[in-house]
UniProtKB/Swiss-Prot annotation:
Keyword Nucleotide-binding: yes
UniProt xrefs under Pfam families: AAA_22, Cdc6_C, Cdc6_lid
A GO molecular-function annotation: ATP hydrolysis activity
Keyword match ATP-binding: yes
Name used for this protein in its record: ORC1-type DNA replication protein
GO BP of this protein: DNA replication
């Protein structure tokens, strides 16, 4: 960078600093933020408090299962109530530890137990590696560290349905029977699930040891979402920077998707960020629509990024057909290119029937459109089109070493390999 470029960059930062500020505290709009009040969740707060109040009397509370779709306030409400419980218990000299575990990340029996042990490492000096020990040994350490003194331990397992679907229900069995093996401490579990049918995945022996109470969180409606956004906006934005239509529009768009407060907060935050980057003095409805487009684009990129390898190869076959002007294509045509690409990668191809299933999955995810059409006496077939531009898909695959080798080849290259 030469001196002129350095000066220009300095001036750019100065200019950006002097621009009218939009955000007073952007963190208020993050999912991780716990507000001082939770509008339209007072009933659920009271129910959780009633279930947990035995702690303050020295009694073990029931285990709790919290249900509701994404963005219905489950996690923030549980965090709010358990934080308040800790404050009150401190006043009464009752030791309470709350351990929050996100089971989308900590997704095995071993890792959940290790996380609980390591929560106490500053107190006990005991730390378990995240892999490598026998699970029974980790469980023994868990009992040892928890039972070092009298206390209540509340273990919050967020997205517990994902843990059970991936790794089974052994962790729940371990934690729900642990109280029979402890002498000083008492343990209670709060499971948070997006899946209302979650308990159908549990073994009868786990169900019998749970003795749980259930709290259901219904979706928010547009008016409730508006109240939530109004409350957060007061702390998040400087006065007068939001146009009157911004919050109602964010609320209405999020209400379409089962009343998702997370989506509403994301829309408001991203709209503010776009306005800030544009140097606008106000956040307008135009910025909300741009935010909606950006969030959908980011979500689609994330979906593509996390596809299994076989689905990525299949998707790239469809990209090549599109770039060659050969869409819509049928399943057989797509399968032919997919098989060539598998050979290029030295990858065992799946059967055409299995690829037909993967095409349906890509269709359900919204990445492609696979419409069944009638060909008269030739029967019915799928017409496959892309819903995402080849450029965007290539851009995601650029950073994926498993699929990268394919990016340099064209449709003709892939077909030539078999000649």
């Amino acid at each position: 960078m030469n001196e002129g470029e350095q000066l220009h960059l300095d001036q750019l930062f100065e200019k950006l600093l002097k621009a009218r500020k939009i955000f007073k505290n952007k963190e208020v709009l993050r999912h991780s933020y716990t507000p001082k009040d939770l509008p339209h969740r007072h009933e659920q707060i009271e129910t959780l408090a009633q279930i947990l109040v035995p702690v303050l009397k020295g009694e073990t509370p029931s285990n709790i299962f919290v249900y509701g779709k994404t963005g219905t306030g489950k996690t923030v409400t549980v965090k709010f109530v358990t934080e308040e419980l800790k404050k009150v218990s401190h006043k009464y000299n009752i030791p309470v530890d709350v351990i929050y575990i996100n089971c989308e990340i900590v997704d095995t029996h071993y890792r959940v137990l290790a996380n609980i042990v390591n929560h106490f490492k500053h107190e006990t000096g005991i730390e378990v590696p995240l892999v490598g020990w026998p699970t029974d040994e980790v469980y023994a350490k868990l009992k040892q560290v928890i039972d070092m003194r009298e206390r209540f331990v509340i273990i919050v397992l967020d997205e517990i349905d994902k843990l059970v679907k991936k790794s089974g229900d052994e962790v729940l069995y371990s934690l729900t029977r642990i109280n029979t093996e402890l002498k000083r401490a008492k343990v209670s579990v709060i499971g948070i699930s997006n899946d209302l049918k979650f308990k159908e995945y549990l073994d009868p022996r786990v169900l019998s040891s749970l003795s749980e109470e259930e709290v259901v969180f219904p979706p928010y409606d547009a008016n409730q979402l508006r109240d939530i956004l109004m409350q957060r906006a007061e702390e998040a934005f400087y006065p007068g920077v939001l146009d009157d239509g911004v919050i109602p529009l964010c609320a209405a768009l999020a209400a379409r998707e089962h009343g998702d407060a997370r989506k509403a907060l994301d829309l408001l935050r991203v709209a503010g960020e776009i306005a800030e980057r544009e140097g606008a003095s106000k956040v307008t409805e135009k910025h909300v629509w741009k935010a909606q487009e950006k969030i959908e684009q980011d979500m689609m990129e994330e979906v593509i990024k996390t596809l299994p390898l076989q689905s990525k190869v299949l998707l790239y076959a469809i990209v090549l057909l599109d770039e060659n002007g050969e869409l819509p294509a049928n399943t057989g045509e797509v399968y032919s290119v997919y098989r060539d690409l598998c050979e290029y990668l030295d990858l065992e191809p799946l059967t055409q029937r299995r690829i037909s299933d993967l095409i349906n999955e890509l269709d359900m995810l919204g990445i492609i459109n696979a419409k069944v059409v009638s060909k008269g006496r030739y029967g019915r077939t799928k017409e496959i089109r892309l819903n995402v531009t080849p450029y965007k898909i290539r851009n995601v695959f650029r950073y994926d070493y498993t699929i990268q080798p394919l990016l340099a080849i064209s449709l003709k290259d892939s077909q030539r390999r078999l000649v």
